[in-house]
Amino acid sequence: MAAKEIFFHQSAREAILRGVRTLSDAVAVTLGPKGRNVVIEKSFGSPTITKDGVTVAKEIDLENKFENMGAQMVKEVASKTSDKAGDGTTTATVLARAIYEEGLKLVAAGHSPMDLKRGIDKAVEVVVGELKSLSKPTADKKAITQVGTISANGDETIGAIIADAMEKVGKEGVITVEEAKGLETTLDVVEGMQFDRGYVSPYFVTNRERMEAVLEDPYILISEKKVSSMQDMIPLLEQVARSGKPLIIIADDIEGEALATLVVNKIRGVLNVCAVKAPGFGDRRKEMLQDIAVLTGGTVVSEDLGHKFETLTLTDLGRAKRVTVDKDNTTVVDGVGTKAAIEGRIKLIRTQIDSVTSDYDREKLQERLAKLVGGVAVINVGAATETEMKEKKARVEDALHATRAAVEEGIVPGGGVAYLRALPALEKLKPGGEQDFGVAIIRRALQEPLRKIASNAGVEGAVVINKVREGTGAFGYNARTEVYEDLEKAGVIDPTKVERTALQNAASVASLLLTTEAMVAERPKGKAKGGGAGAGMPDYGGDDMDY
C-alpha cells in the first residue's frame, strides 16, 4: 500500500480553501448577463466554449491532491444543483465559496466548527422559508418566456420557443433538444403517442413520396406474442376485411409466413395493413404495450393471460383516429380509450415515478407519462458551426430545465435580489451562543451573487448591494441595461427551485468542509518523507503540518 500524506487543522482547511477559490474563480466569471465565456480544451475535436457553470466545474482537476479535494467538493455542489434544478450552478459555487471563506475566518479565530454548522443550517432553513413566501406562480406564457430567456443568456428566441413548447405539450409533456440540419432553431410538436419503432417492411408504405404508412380510423392489434404463423390469424383478418377498416399490428415480432401473407394481401388490395415491432424490451415492453392498449381501448394479447389469436374479435382491438408509421417511428393520434382508464393509468405511472430510485427508470416513466398526457415537442437547434451548435444546445437545455423548475415551484426576482430580501428574516433569528456566528456567515454569503453579477458588469458590488437593500420587493439592479428598476416587470426573474437548491447545496457542502480536521492523500512519488517538496513536485506546505 502506498504511503499517505496527512494534513491537520488549519493547514488542511487552508488547502481546501485554495482549491475552492481556484474552481470558484473559473466558474464565477460566467455569472450574470455580462458574465464571460470559458474556453475548454478537448482531447479531440474543437474546444468547447461555454457560459455554463457546471460544464466549467466538471472540467477542473487540480494537480495538488489536497487542493483538488476542496475543488471536487464544490464541483459536487454545482453538479447536484444542476441535477436537481437544472440551473443555478454558478450561483451555488459562489455561495459555497462565500460560506466557506467566512466560516474559515471564524474557525481560525477559535470558534467551534460544529456550532457554526448548526447556525448555518438554521439560517438556511429560514431563508428557504422566506424564498417560498416571496415566490409567485408562473401563471402565464410571458413569465415562462422570461425565465427561458434569462437562462439562455438573454436569447429571446430560445425563451419564446421553450414557452411555445410548454404551452403545446403541457407540464407533463416531454420536450427534447436535438441538432437541426440548418441554421434556424425550430419547434416540432408530435401529437398523440409516438414510439421509436417503424414498419417491418417498406411494402406497407401508403405514401411513396414521404415513405410512410398513414392509416385512417384503423383497428389496432396489440400483442406480446410473436406472429409467425398465419393460420391462427385468419378468423380475425377476415373480420377486419369485412369491416373495410385498415389494420395495424403491433407485436413482439412479425416474421416468416405471417409477414409474407400480410405483404401479399396489402399489395393485392385485399387488406390495408401495416405491421410494427413492439417498442421497448423485457418488462418495459409489456408496460408500453399496456399504455397503447389503454390509450386505444384495446386488449394486449398475452400468453400469460391465456389469450389466443383465433378467439379474438373486433372488440379486443384498439381504435384510433389516425396512425402514421415511417421507417423509424409510429405515431398514434386520438385513441378511443376511455378517459377513466387513461387517468387510472396516468395515476399508476405517477405513483411509480415517486417511488422509483433509479434516474434512468424515472426518465423512462416520465416519457411514458408524457405520451399518455400531453405529447412530445422537439426543439431543433440550428447554428452555423459545430462549436456554436454545442454552446447553443447547452443553453437551450439549461433554459428548458429552468422553465420546468419555474413551473414547479414558481419564480422570485432575479439578479441576486431574492437573497437580499431574505436578509431581514435572518436579523430576527437569534439561536444564541456561537450559532449566531453561523447565521452571520449566511447573512454575508447571501450578498455574494449580486456582488459578483455587479463586478462582472464592471461596477462596484458594495455600492449596488447598498442601493438595492434600500429598495423593496423586486427592486434591483438590471446588469444588462445597467439601471435600477423593478426586475419582475423587466423580466429578470429566477425559478424559486433554482435559488433554493443552490443555497441548500452550497451550505451543505461548505459547512461540512468547515468541520474538516484532517486530510489524507497518497504521497506523490519522489517526495521526501519529511513532507518538503520532492524532486519536481509541488510544495504542499509540509512545514506547517502537524504529526
Curated annotation (Swiss-Prot):
Pfam families: Cpn60_TCP1
GO molecular function, one term: isomerase activity
Residues covered by region (Disordered): 524-547
Alphabetical UniProt keywords: ATP-binding, Chaperone, Cytoplasm, Isomerase, Nucleotide-binding
InterPro entries xrefs: Chaperonin_Cpn60_CS, Cpn60/GroEL, Cpn60/GroEL/TCP-1, GroEL-like_apical_dom_sf, GROEL-like_equatorial_sf, TCP-1-like_intermed_sf
Keyword Isomerase part of the UniProt annotation: yes
Protein name per UniProt: Chaperonin GroEL 1
